[in-house]
Amino acid sequence: MYPFKKILVALDATSMDEALIQFASFLAHNTPAESVHFVNVIKSTQLPSSLKKEFPNLMEAAIQDRKKMLEKIIIEHFDMTNHEIKVKISVEQGNLPSKHVLKLAEKHNIDAIVVGRKKKLKNSSVVTQRLARRATCSLLIVPEKEYTNMNRIMVATDFSKESATALQEAIVVAERGTHAGQDVEIICHHVYQVPIGYHYTGKSYDECGDVMQKNAKKQYRAFIDKIDTQGIEIKPLFSWDRNDNVVAVIYEKALQMDVNCIVIGGKGKSASTDFFPIGTNTERLISRDTEIPLLIVRPKHVNAGLMEMLQKI
């Protein structure tokens, strides 16, 4: 686990930016953040040579105008009272926003990338999935809504080392919130299933479900014993997935319990592969049109093949 000291926020000059800036402000003041870097990518346009000759600084002027516009919105929605947090704004030019975001994240050794999820844009998860697979740091996906607190965090766990990392990150956020006078609750949620072929055991479906739950509770005790909870209370939750849809169970429980953020562990990347395997359930959570922020926590790596990978995006 590593603290979120450097945060990169991807803006797109739409109404979504207000929610992103507001959430970035909340995140920065509830983590050990030292800097927040806002970036926006303006689409490259092929201008006729005559127009370029007449207005040689047209694109530069557009970039400066965009930067001034973003500065105004950021001042309105980002809490600047903590002068120790450095705020930077960059406006880039290109046709693939995700590529520029990834390059900036690598260049500035970013710990977490924050991106938005629009309500009305059903295909917005395509860019987000690209970032989730290829970013060398954690990714926070923020739906288009207003945020005022984060007092209930759900960590989806399968008791793996990735889940342990996700829980530790949630503990950091909860600890900061507690110090600020907030009552933050962490729910460690495990979804279990009855395996195919259960009938060969001679037990009924419900009996096998009971066995799986007992086993999950045993695994949880072994899992939580290795975690430094920093005095934060962790509440275990065990849910039985009867319809072969783990993601639906996670999300429905999160809605029922009024969860402010779902945290899940993502895998790291080996030097021999071009993509980060984020896991089937993580990918389905990204694709789902949720109203709850999703934080994908992954180990931070710098690989020799990174630049080659970026060229393929």
Which residues does each predicted region cover?
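Small/aliphatic-rich secondary-structure junction motif
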Residues: 1-56, 152-209, 228-232, 288-289, ...
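Structural beta-alpha unit
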Residues: 1-2, 43, 57, 75-113, ...
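Gly/Ser-rich helix-loop-strand patches that form or flank binding pockets
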Residues: 3, 26-30, 99-149, 254-308
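Short glycine-rich, flexible loops that bind phosphorylated cofactors or substrates
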Residues: 16, 121-122, 162, 246, ...
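General small-molecule cofactor/ligand-binding pocket signal
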Residues: 37-39, 86-92, 140, 187-189, ...
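Conserved N-terminal ligand/cofactor-binding loop architecture of enzyme catalytic domains
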Residues: 43, 49-52, 56-68, 75-77
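A short acidic, glycine-rich active-site loop
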Residues: 56-69, 206-218
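Structured core of small recognition/catalytic domains
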Residues: 181-263
